[in-house]
C-alpha cells in the first residue's frame, strides 16, 4: 500500500491516536501529524489513489467515512459530522465528492 511506503508507521499511529475520540478529527492537524503536508504533490496523489477504494477517480462521502482505515486497519470510522465537514472543506466544485486535485490542494493549503 502507498501509505506504508510514503509515511512513517510512528507518524500514522501518533495521528490516529490523536483523533481516536469521536468528533475529534481535524483534517489539517491530521495531515500535518501523519506527514502528508511534507509530501510532494505527486506523492499526495499516490495517497489519494490508495484512499479511492473503488478507483473512480474521486473520494466519495462513503469512502471518506473510512479514510482513517486507509492509513491503518486500527483507524476508526469518521462520524457523519466529521465526514460532512471534511467533504465540505475539500469539495471546492460542489459535486459532492473529492477529486485528486481538490485533495492535493486541501493537504497543502
Curated annotation (Swiss-Prot):
Gene3D superfamilies hit by this protein: EF-hand
Gene Ontology annotations for the cellular component aspect, listed alphabetically: cytoplasm
Family label: Belongs to the parvalbumin family.
Origin: domain of life: Eukaryota
Record keyword Metal-binding present: yes
Binding-site positions, Ca(2+) 1: 52, 54, 56, 58, 60, 63
Binding site for Ca(2+) 2: 91, 93, 95, 97, 102
UniProt xrefs under Pfam families: EF-hand_7
Function, in words: In muscle, parvalbumin is thought to be involved in relaxation after contraction. It binds two calcium ions.
Residues modified to N-acetylalanine: 2
Keywords, sorted A to Z: Acetylation, Calcium, Metal-binding, Muscle protein, Repeat
Keyword Transit peptide appears in the UniProt entry: no
GO molecular function, one term: calcium ion binding
Protein name (Swiss-Prot/TrEMBL): Parvalbumin-7
Segments forming domain EF-hand: 39-74, 78-109
Species of origin: Danio rerio
Amino acid at each position: 500500500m502507498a501509505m506504508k511506503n510514503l509515511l512513517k508507521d510512528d507518524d500514522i499511529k501518533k495521528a490516529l491516536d490523536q483523533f481516536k475520540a469521536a468528533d475529534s478529527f481535524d483534517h489539517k492537524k491530521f495531515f500535518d501529524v501523519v506527514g502528508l503536508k511534507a509530501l510532494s504533490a505527486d506523492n499526495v496523489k499516490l495517497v489519494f489513489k490508495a484512499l479511492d477504494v473503488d478507483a473512480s477517480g474521486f473520494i466519495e462521502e462513503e469512502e471518506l467515512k473510512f479514510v482513517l482505515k486507509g492509513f491503518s486497519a486500527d483507524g476508526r470510522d469518521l462520524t457523519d459530522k466529521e465526514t460532512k465537514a471534511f467533504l465540505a472543506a475539500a469539495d471546492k466544485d460542489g459535486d459532492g465528492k473529492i477529486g485528486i486535485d481538490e485533495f492535493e490542494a486541501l493537504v497543502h493549503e
